[in-house]
Structures are given as structure tokens and as C-alpha cells.
UniProtKB/Swiss-Prot annotation:
Entry's EC annotation: 2.8.1.6
Residues involved in [2Fe-2S] cluster binding: 142, 174, 233, 309
Species annotation: Methanocaldococcus jannaschii (strain ATCC 43067 / DSM 2661 / JAL-1 / JCM 10045 / NBRC 100440) (Methanococcus jannaschii)
SMART domains named among the record's database cross-references: BATS, Elp3
Name used for this protein in its record: Biotin synthase
Length: 358
């Protein structure tokens, strides 16, 4: 019975015809493994290969954010002990990007010498991108700043940083700079930059996670970016007390906006944030491994032609089951996050190589 239904929903997804009722039915009646299998078949029908696109970020401006997002350690309303600093210089941003390339080079050398333990699979070399004699496993580099928006001087510095990165590396550049106006978006379009602006939650649930800016503020930026033919990366953060229905609603809202890439973040509660206190007090129930995997699979089923990438909270929430998500993912964020530590690139590459060898 499940097999027949999988074939039915496979055909429907490939035609981009999955609706809300379908998605809710799948969540309620299919196991996480069954949903992953369905999403895996969808991904393989669409893509000629299963290469996982890796991206990394720099926290280019940290803390002192006047917004009150309940999950964020950079908000002035949180009590977190995090690094606080103004916008890094263009040279500092460039050097950070170069460190990522250097790390790829060192890993490549270790593979060639046979000293990278656990990387016996030849697929590890295959999942990279050609780059001056060695694979560049990290495809994208995103410049992220705290705050609702950046000022004109900060924007100029970031533009110059992007120009340097493009001149001196093969990295594709993304920017997460808050609420950008049309003129700034037009400048970024000239630089072939992908814009990042998370919805964070569904339209109906957004009021529960932030009051200092609106869901509509974010949608306005995304729509303006799409009008200018910019690529847009937009997703959300899950595990903030939202219902399954709200998670599914956001998928359809993102689909309607026509975003190109959808990052899935799962709450990693940080002591000092409002979300942490809500979990501690029992107001929010942490997301389970099964629910997280169902969510990832459903987003691929609902949006088969968008890039689904796993970002913040994957280590904390999926633990030993991260590799299961690789069945359906198009992308993965590697390295450190904004204020939390990630895994080293080498460990993630080993995980990907092991998956590709199955």
C-alpha cells in the first residue's frame, strides 16, 4: 500500500502538484524513512547527480541587534555571552573566505598523501568543484550581518569585499544583510550575488517569534529581489513551538515566492535567549529527530525544484542521523554558524563520501 502511494505522490511532486492536504497526509501517515525514500526518488529523478552543494558563512557584524527574535543570541533582548563587534573590514572578510579555500587545499593534500583517515572513498574527490588543481568542496560563501538593516557605509564596505572575493577566489557569494532596499538590491545584482532573507516562520506564526519587524517586511524584500532576477535563499527556523501545519504552510509560502534555495534551520537553544527559557519552562517542546527528518523530506516533496539545504542546528538536533538527511538534501552549511560552533569540514566531507559510497 505504501509503495503504491509513494509512486502516486512521486508523480504528483514531479508535476509540482503537491498541495497542503497531500503534505499533511504524508506527514501523518508516513514514517520518516518512507518520506525520505519518497523525497530521495524525487531528487534523483530531477538531478543527474547527487552532489551536495556546500556553503559557509562569516558573521561579519555581530551582536547589538535591536530586533527581538526569540531564537537569536545577537538580540539586545537576549542575555547571551557572545562576541560583539562592528562590521569587519573588506580585507578581514576576504581573509576568512581564503581560509575556507586553504582548508580545502589541506584536505586535498591529505587525501593525496593517504593520511586522511576514514576518507578511503574516491568519491570524496568527486564531490568537489574544480579549483586551481584541487577540489573546492565549498561552493558558496555568505556574508552575514546582525541588525535589521545595514547603513550606506557598511554596504559600500561589503560591496568592496564581494569584489575582492570574486577577484581572488572561485567562491560564489551570498549576502544576508537584513532588509535591503531596491537600490542596494540592484547593486548586488550587478555583482551576481544570491540574496538571503529567511521568512523564519509562517505568516500566521511569525508574530510569536518577533514583534520588531514583520513577515510582510521580509516578503517585500524577497519579491523585490525576484523582480530584479536575483537568486533568493529563504527558509526558516523550526522548533519554536509551531505546529506541523504551520511548518507546512511556510513551505507553500516559500514556494509561492519562487525562492531558489531553502535553508532549514532547527533550533539550537542557547542559554540567555527567550526560546531557551520557553523550552526550559516547558512552553516549547524540542523537535524530535523523526520530526526533523520528516520536515526536511516534506520540503523537498513540496518544492522539488528548489535547493533544499540543511543549516543551523543540524548537529545538535539530528546527532547520529545527519547522514539520513543527505538522501534528499541539495545543500549543506558547513563550518561555524553565527554564534555556535559547527563541525570541521573534514568530518562533513567524510560523512558525504560515506553516503556517496552506499
Amino acid at each position: 500500500m505504501i509503495f503504491m502511494e509513494i509512486e502516486t505522490f512521486l508523480k504528483k511532486s514531479l508535476k509540482n502538484k503537491i498541495d497542503f492536504d497531500d503534505a499533511l497526509y504524508l506527514y501523518n501517515n508516513f514514517s520518516a524513512i518512507d518520506l525520505l525514500y519518497l523525497a530521495f526518488k524525487i531528487k534523483n529523478r530531477i538531478k543527474n547527480n547527487s552532489k551536495i552543494k556546500l556553503c559557509a558563512i562569516i558573521n561579519a557584524k555581530s551582536g547589538k541587534c535591536k530586533e527581538d527574535c526569540i531564537f537569536c543570541s545577537q538580540s539586545i533582548y537576549s542575555k547571551c555571552n557572545i562576541p560583539i563587534y562592528p562590521l569587519k573590514s573588506k580585507k578581514e572578510i576576504l581573509e576568512y573566505a581564503k581560509k575556507i579555500i586553504d582548508e580545502c587545499s589541506k584536505i586535498s593534500s591529505s587525501i593525496e598523501r593517504g593520511t586522511l583517515i576514514g576518507a578511503e572513498s574516491p568519491n570524496l574527490m568527486d564531490v568537489g568543484y574544480p579549483n586551481r588543481g584541487f577540489p573546492l568542496w565549498v561552493e558558496r560563501f555568505s556574508i552575514v550581518t546582525s541588525g535589521k538593516k545595514i547603513n550606506d557605509d557598511e554596504f559600500i564596505e561589503i560591496v568592496e569585499a564581494i569584489e575582492l572575493i570574486k577577484e581572488e577566489t572561485n567562491l560564489k557569494v551570498c549576502c544576508s544583510l537584513g532588509l535591503l532596499d531596491r537600490e542596494k538590491l540592484k547593486e548586488l545584482k550587478k555583482l551576481d550575488v544570491r540574496i538571503h532573507n529567511n521568512l523564519e516562520a509562517s505568516k500566521n506564526y511569525f508574530k510569536n517569534i518577533c514583534s520588531t519587524h514583520s513577515y510582510e517586511d521580509k516578503v517585500k524584500v524577497i519579491k523585490e529581489a525576484k523582480k530584479l532576477d536575483l537568486e533568493v535563499c529563504s527558509g526558516g527556523i523550526f522548533g519554536l513551538g509551531e505546529s506541523v501545519e504551520e511548518r507546512i504552510k511556510m513551505a507553500f509560502e516559500l514556494k509561492e515566492l519562487g525562492v531558489d534555495s531553502v535553508p532549514i534551520n532547527i533550533l539550537h537553544p542557547i542559554e540567555g535567549t527567550k526560546a531557551y527559557e520557553k523550552i526550559k519552562n516547558g512552553e516549547i517542546k524540542p523537535i524530535s529527530v523523526s520530526d526533523a527528518l520528516k520536515l526536511i523530506a516534506l520540503y523537498k516533496i513540496i518544492m522539488p525544484y528548489a535547493e533544499i539545504r540543511l543549516a543551523g542546528g543540524r548537529i545538535y538536533n539530528l546527532r547520529d542521523f545527519q547522514s539520513y538527511a543527505l538522501m534528499v538534501l541539495d545543500g549543506l552549511m558547513v563550518g561555524n554558524y553565527l554564534t555556535t560552533k559547527g563541525r570541521c569540514l573534514e568530518d562533513d566531507l567524510k560523512m558525504i563520501a560515506d553516503f556517496h559510497s552506499l
